[in-house]
Amino acid sequence: MAKIAKRVSKTREGIDPNKAYALGEALKLLKDRSSVKFDETVEVAMNLGVDPRHADQMVRGVVNLPNGTGRSVRVAVFARGDKAEEAKAAGADIVGAEDLVDIVQKGTIDFDRCIATPDMMPLVGRLGKVLGPRGMMPNPKVGTVTTDVAAAVKASKGGAVEFRVEKAGIVHAGVGKVSFDVKALEENIRAFADAVTKAKPAGAKGNYVKKVSVTSTMGPGLKLDVSTLAAS
């Protein structure tokens, strides 16, 4: 415990909790203070001026990060026939129909992202209580209910990140690894912030983006100067 406390103290050394850091400066600080033996995930959190309890203030979408996420994503596809073959050829890890529904209903979820063809949704709909709480339920709004399964699989494998606002009005996502260079992380974060901004719902009033922060798995949370998130 003493070692952990010492490491936490060291990572926060010199960090001003009241300062809004420029994006590049914040990322350099996170990289410089990484002292663990694994490649930490860099995560961005955006506090939005919405109340997701109201349907017209829901924020949801998907963004393709230009430099990927740095993590291996296992993709499951619910499809039959030619579409199942297309999914396999595109690199899907698990492909099935009724058999895959049965497996998931029994509680075996050996994947990170789920795609379905439209004709499979009556079956996949039975899995709402299992996949819904995990944020894995296929949805046409984020491109995971589609006839173009090959493109969806490749996007999922290549850096597609889904986002959805939580009860407190916060939307967050992993946007890369500490091992990424600063430029790659900046590009990913700007792409994410831009996607969230464009997903502003009609019911949102007043200041939409209230606060943005960036952190790493074991690192400090740094408040960002929102003006530095705009594409340069």
Swiss-Prot record:
The keyword tRNA-binding applies. The keyword tRNA-binding applies. Binds directly to 23S rRNA. The L1 stalk is quite mobile in the ribosome, and is involved in E site tRNA release. Part of the 50S ribosomal subunit. This is Large ribosomal subunit protein uL1. GO terms for cellular component: cytosolic large ribosomal subunit. It comes from Mesorhizobium japonicum (strain LMG 29417 / CECT 9101 / MAFF 303099). Keywords: Repressor, Ribonucleoprotein, Ribosomal protein, RNA-binding, rRNA-binding, Translation regulation, tRNA-binding. HAMAP family: Ribosomal_uL1_B. Pfam families: Ribosomal_L1. Belongs to the universal ribosomal protein uL1 family. GO terms for molecular function: rRNA binding; structural constituent of ribosome; tRNA binding. One of its GO terms (biological process) is regulation of translation.
